[in-house]
C-alpha cells in the first residue's frame, strides 16, 4: 500500500447534492487521512447559518481558510468579514457560523484534527444568528 492518497475534488462526495445549494465535501475519509480532518465548502449567495443555527465543538479546534469570495463569520457575539487569503482559528467551545451575502460564491477549506466521532463532537447552537 502506498504512503499517500490522491483524489480530485470532483471525486469526493458532495453531501449537499440535491438537498442544499453549494457543496460540502469531507475530503478526510476519501483520502484515508489518519490524523487531519479537511473539508471543502462552496457557498453560493445567501447560504450558511445566518438566520438560524451555529455550532461549537467538544474537542475539535477548527481553522477556516477562505479560498475565494468574501464571507461573514459570527464567532460568539462578534460578526466580521473574511475574504480570499484570510484564515481564522476557532477554539472548540466557541460558537460559530458562516454566511455568504455576496453575489459570488465563497469557498472555504476547514481543517481540524481527525476524531473518531465527528458528529458526536459537534454541538448545535439553535437561534445563534437571528436577525
What does each model-identified segment do?
Residues 59, 78, 94-95, 104:
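A generic "binding-loop/recognition-motif" signal
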Residues 26, 40-58:
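Conserved short histidine dyad/triad with adjacent acidic residue
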Residues 73-74, 90, 96-102:
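Short beta-strand His + acidic residue motifs that chelate non-heme Fe in jelly-roll/DSBH
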Residues 99-131:
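Double-stranded beta-helix
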Residues 77-92:
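Short acidic-glycine-tyrosine-enriched beta hairpin
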Residues 33-36, 44-49, 70, 116-117:
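Short, charged/polar surface micro-motifs in flexible loops or helix N-caps
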Residues 1-38, 123-131:
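A short, N-terminal "cap"/entry segment at the start of jelly-roll beta-barrel domains
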Residues 59-71:
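Glycine- and acidic-residue-biased ligand/ion/polar-headgroup-sensing regions
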